[in-house]
């Protein structure tokens, strides 16, 4: 154990040394034409952080904390106060509120009840049962982190599978053939089915992971890449996508891709050859019956969550309500430069989605549902990663580095058809995400994709501003559609780590789905870009 740990430390130090050497070489090299000295140092910082993120040499949040240090040490920023501004970005507080709301849902098992209810009511056939698991997972993943959702749903799925296959037949990696189970049960059609793994098991568990990733696309707080993009658009372009606006981006993607992945898993790749799932449906109902009815505190959490989600959506409907509300109330509720009911001019709006989210935290405490030590038990590392990414995005924009990268690397690609541009962005993002986390990929690529606005504006027939939004949104969506390797997304890692899926199952299935989803996302994004987003987002 000591030798192995020593070897790991040595490997980490070697990787870190190589990254530092590359960073120094960029910093001391002659400044490229069209790039300022500050831009060169920012480029070196981007190389340093990006390399550490991709290689996993250091934990992602630790690398994020190094960004403001390097930016200040090299003189890109005069002081740490300026370099640390990204760590106080409003979206960090939105995600913090989302994490805390999710903690409250989990404390009272509200998320588990929703999942079990869906499975008990929908799971009348093998395919419908898998669909119920995927629908529950995707729906919860819009509001609870996809990591927490998958961690909760995986044991539920295994428990339900044990009733379908008999508990001895839920194969784990390394198991021999279950006693009394013919090996033929594992070869009931489909592709890549190992002897001990039935199609039902593979389809349900992979469906759980993939549904969590897809569902996260639906809302800003559903998955970190969404918030990373929104934060960097605000940092670089000063453009803000609200909670309701993101629903117009994410929900169509979820509504199209989730049923398609379910169909491919259950009809094409792993069609279940089991007729009767009554016991599984009964098991889901039994799990649900074991849950006591929600106590008053749990009901108050449900009310607060529902009210928060409703106000998030309502906050994006100001344009539609302007004809029915006095100007003073429009400014107070939805923001603007006019007079408010408080007698002051200019207001962000009480229904601003970050304000609504943050106010849910004291509401949980006042309702006597959560203690502070329960609220703060959240993923602070992800919040630090957001801060580092926004700090880097600010520096890339302030020094003109994103525009320089876009013009230098991608200028020869102008004139490509729109569909080919989208396909290239989606394919590159999916490929990179398979090698590193989707959060790290988005943090690295979002500033570059935003910078491509100046390169492809004429090709797309849009302004540079709109082109930057379009390309970067496409990339952020694609970051949630890497299905082949455990490292790509937290849901993939959790399902693989459960021991009930082999990496070969995920790899073969994921490669096929990656190819299909690249084509589907390309067409879907083009349709949204052509007929929806221009009328609703800009």
Placement of each model-derived feature along the sequence:
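Hydrophobic transmembrane alpha-helices of multi-pass small-molecule transporters
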Residues: 1-94, 235-238, 245-407, 422, ...
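Membrane-core helix-loop-helix motifs of multi-pass transport proteins
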Residues: 168-178, 182-275, 292-295, 491-525
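Alpha-helical transmembrane segments of multi-pass membrane proteins
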Residues: 127-139, 166-215, 241-248, 418-431, ...
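Short amphipathic alpha-helical coupling elements at transmembrane boundaries
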Residues: 82-85, 113-123, 159-162, 166, ...
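Hydrophobic or amphipathic alpha-helical targeting/insertion segments
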Residues: 73-76, 86-169, 203, 207, ...
